[in-house]
């Protein structure tokens, strides 16, 4: 929710958006959009994310776009595995791919709570170089997940454990890949 409220706190010449997956129920989707857009932010449907970010860049519009990757990718969306909390874990790579395509600077923000309704978000640069200049062996995605793990260990009450990051195993994924190639 903090991404949706950023326009309330920062300069009006900076657009703020968050990536979201439209809900199947149109009434709930409308309600969700109304609540998330009430402070002036923009909900960007996942399927049009790259197009919208390219449009913002083309028009030289400064923007902060929130990518949240707290869930497990579907089988057909798994393109990368990384070590996360001592387990091989499938992860989304959209932030890295889009960041490279549009020359974006990418930050990571920890979510912690000082007291009721106060959530300081210390933003940290993941890499000092734009992501496209990072050596191949140093994937942005692999730099991001250890930070989440550290934050989860320090503040487990803020992580959505219900999302079950490990419901998809690498062995099952490899088996499915082999079946598809037959």
Q: Where are the model-predicted features located?
A:
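Membrane-interfacial amphipathic helices and adjacent loop/beta segments
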Residues: 17-48
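Short glycine-enriched loops at secondary-structure junctions
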Residues: 1, 22-24, 111-116
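A short secondary-structure junction signal
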Residues: 4-8, 28-32, 77-80
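Conserved H-X4-D acyltransferase segment
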Residues: 1-16
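Non-catalytic C-terminal accessory region of glycerolipid acyltransferases
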Residues: 11-15, 38, 47-182
